[in-house]
């Protein structure tokens, strides 16, 4: 018998994860949400994955045959954008400077970096769908900035470890 979902979440909160805003476009509809379940899959072809809960508006748009999406990797100073896309029912795109990438998906002009994707494949897994995206365009926007990280139920920064004996 598998462990309880509360135990599962308790363990995973100890794993630090980068914070992204995933935006999805289908037809004229767009939506976005904060996602930490993001990973690279393959360099050839360039593939990434995001995991999207079945219950949300984003999942509905991802399921359309014309869906495109972008993964916006947030900078350490972009907690407000992360929170807006995680919790707000207001116009999520009202904060931040947004533009349209090659596929038509919204990308954040001043993110750390972004990946613009078409849906390569879908895989149902429990309460979520794993979307594999084929990267059509990408950009490192602010290469000298630190990423936003989420660990142990809070946003964190990255601190370089310095060994004075080196």
Regions found by a protein language model. Name each.
Residues 1-166:
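Basic, polyanion-binding surface patches
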């Amino acid at each position: 018998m598998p462990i309880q979902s509360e135990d599962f979440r308790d363990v995973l909160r100890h794993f630090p994860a980068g914070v992204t805003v995933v935006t999805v476009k289908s037809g004229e509809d767009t939506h976005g949400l904060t996602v930490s379940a993001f990973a690279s899959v393959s360099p050839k072809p360039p593939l990434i994955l995001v995991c999207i809960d079945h219950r949300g508006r984003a999942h509905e748009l991802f399921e359309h045959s014309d869906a495109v999406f972008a993964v916006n990797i947030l900078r350490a100073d972009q907690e407000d954008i992360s929170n807006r896309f995680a919790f707000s029912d207001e116009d999520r795109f009202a904060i931040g400077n947004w533009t349209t990438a090659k596929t038509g998906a919204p990308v954040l002009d001043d993110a750390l970096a972004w990946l613009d994707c078409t849906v390569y494949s879908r895989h149902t897994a429990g309460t979520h769908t794993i979307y594999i995206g084929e990267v059509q365009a990408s950009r490192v926007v602010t290469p000298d900035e630190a990423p936003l990280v989420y660990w142990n139920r809070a946003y964190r920064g990255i601190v370089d470890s310095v060994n004075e004996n080196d």
